Amino acid sequence: MSTSRQQQGRHQGHIARKRFGQNFLVDMGVIDSIVDVIRPQRGERMVEIGPGLGALTEPLIERLATPEAPLHAVELDRDLIGRLKTKFGGLLELHAGDALAFDFGSLAAPGEKASLRIVGNLPYNISSPLLFHLTSFAHRVIDQHFMLQNEVVERMVAEPGTKAFSRLSVMLQYRYVIDKQLDVPPEAFNPPPKVDSAIVRMIPYELHELAPVDERVLGEVVTAAFSQRRKMLRNTLAAYRDSVDFEALGFDLQRRAEDVPVDEYVRVAQIVAAKA
């Protein structure tokens, strides 16, 4: 790595590691705006994914953490874990490991009620699989606020009939109310990413608000539909024509995958699951 690249990727004596997808947030104005969007309250159960050097961690701790109710954080980089422990002490409870394998439900309060808030500047190289991993814990979560690549956020909030509407749109919109909150330019980071970023808010639907469906089957149906985006659904969903009477359902196969609303995919998946 050249000296200039090293300097650009160095912040507070730490060089950003590409394999961890590290881009450290450094713009204090942006940090303040993000915290204002999150609105942390004293004593809340909150976990930060990928705290990095603590740019977001510090103001979150100031607003919500107590020794009895610390901010939780999941971090993979062991060098950063040591620094964070030294800086924040008992106000930050660190969990060393990969967020893709972490049991976020273990941090929720006992009982069935949603109690956990999740935040983070997510590594862009694992953002989609991490978002899918988090759906398993949606029933324990109050809300999620994430920094993501703007292109991913646009897909998350996309409406049917638009090019951005995708498998990610369907699967996440089934589980969450999703809203884009804030645009973040590359220069807010060190090193600056090559893409624009955005803050997104995700509020899980309560279980009684969800149409009952086997999410594994829903995922299979949606994956098949979007497997060849330019083809009509009569081709991509052909394997389901024996189990689903699409005409009786009022499901038009003369459409492409991006033209179908979430609730229609759910109805197809319900029938497929019932006949399995």
From Swiss-Prot:
Molecular function (GO) terms for this protein are:
16S rRNA (adenine(1518)-N(6)/adenine(1519)-N(6))-dimethyltransferase activity; RNA binding
Keyword list, A-Z: Cytoplasm, Methyltransferase, RNA-binding, rRNA processing, S-adenosyl-L-methionine, Transferase
The cellular component terms of Gene Ontology attached to this UniProt record, alphabetical and capped at eight, are: cytosol
Task: Give the InterPro entries listed for this entry.
Answer: KsgA/Erm (IPR001737), rRNA_Ade_diMease-like_C (IPR023165), rRNA_Ade_methylase_Trfase_N (IPR020598), rRNA_adenine_dimethylase (IPR011530), SAM-dependent_MTases_sf (IPR029063)
Residues involved in S-adenosyl-L-methionine binding? N23, L25, G50, E75, D98, N121
Q: Which cysteines are joined by disulfide bonds?
A: none
Q: Per its UniProt entry, what is the enzyme's top EC class, as one word?
A: transferase
Family named by the database record: Belongs to the class I-like SAM-binding methyltransferase superfamily. rRNA adenine N(6)-methyltransferase family. RsmA subfamily.
Spell out the protein name for this chain: Ribosomal RNA small subunit methyltransferase A
Q: Which organism is it from?
A: Paraburkholderia phytofirmans (strain DSM 17436 / LMG 22146 / PsJN)
